[in-house]
Amino acid sequence: MDSHSPIATVAQALRRAERILVITGAGLSADSGMPTYRGLGGLYNGRTEEGLPIEAALSGPMLRRDPALCWKYLAELGKACLAARPNAGHEAIAELQKHKPECWVLTQNIDGFHRQAGSPAERLIEIHGELAPLYCQSCGAESGGLEEHLHGQLPPRCAACGGVLRPPVVLFEEMLPEEAIDTLYRELRKGFDAVLVVGTTASFPYIVEPVLRTRQAGGFTAEVNPGVTDLSERVDVKMTGRALDIMPQVVSHIYR
């Protein structure tokens, strides 16, 4: 490989770095067969069968007002996640974390693929939550995994009190989880030597801020994306392509 190629440049920077933040979005899981979408989980674009914007169907207010409708689309989202698996991009990121004990992952994805690929939970910030375990909105009781509830009557109900179950995921019009935000900003205050943005359109402040902060502090920044994003001209190196193809090359170049 050309020692001046984007992949070689990123590999060299990551080899030197100790504190690393990898930010991932729907584009990473698209390579596992998950459709991309700029918001929740990457499943939909446009309107539902009922003529609603998907943001309205998969929202906190809709879950309260019409839980059956909200769960119709939560169930499709869940089935898509359960039918897919982590890909080589997830595995390469987990491998990087294994070698770099201060490498963190901040993900917008709710599919759990980083955990499945081996990323340590204590260095994984799931900013939009995850799809399991379900819990009761009324009494708070946990009710197991997602799969057992997807093929019965919707919305799924709590065995203890009959309340509507939900996953610990951030729906539209809901607040981001306080613990995840606190963890992110605690680590940001410590600073990062390098930030790598993988498969996200970077339209949220908590995606953009770590990149800008790190670059202003003299750190290294890079992006992996097949298209142009808001960050493409604001990072040190842009790697054009799929995370599935690029991330294994980056990590193997570090540890070859």
Swiss-Prot record:
Q: Where in the cell is it found?
A: Cytoplasm
The record lists NAD(+) as bound by 25-44, 108-111, 199-201, 225-227, 243
Quick check: keyword Cell membrane in the entry? no
| Catalytic residues as annotated in Swiss-Prot or TrEMBL | 128
Q: Which Gene3D superfamilies does the record associate with it?
A: SIR2/SIRT2 'Small Domain (3.30.1600.10), TPP-binding domain (3.40.50.1220)
Predominant subcellular localization, coarse grouping? cytoplasm
Stored InterPro entries: DHS-like_NAD/FAD-binding_dom, NAD-dep_sirtuin_deacylases, Sirtuin, Sirtuin_cat_small_dom_sf, Ssirtuin_cat_dom
Record-listed E.C. numbers: 2.3.1.286
**Cofactor field:** Zn(2+)
Q: Name the keywords, alphabetized.
A: Cytoplasm, Metal-binding, NAD, Transferase, Zinc
Q: Name one Pfam family in it.
A: SIR2
Regarding protein family, the annotation reads: Belongs to the sirtuin family. Class III subfamily.
How is this protein named in the record?
A: NAD-dependent protein deacylase 2
Gene source species: Pseudomonas aeruginosa (strain ATCC 15692 / DSM 22644 / CIP 104116 / JCM 14847 / LMG 12228 / 1C / PRS 101 / PAO1)
Source organism phylogeny: Bacteria, Pseudomonadati, Pseudomonadota, Gammaproteobacteria, Pseudomonadales
Primary gene name: cobB2
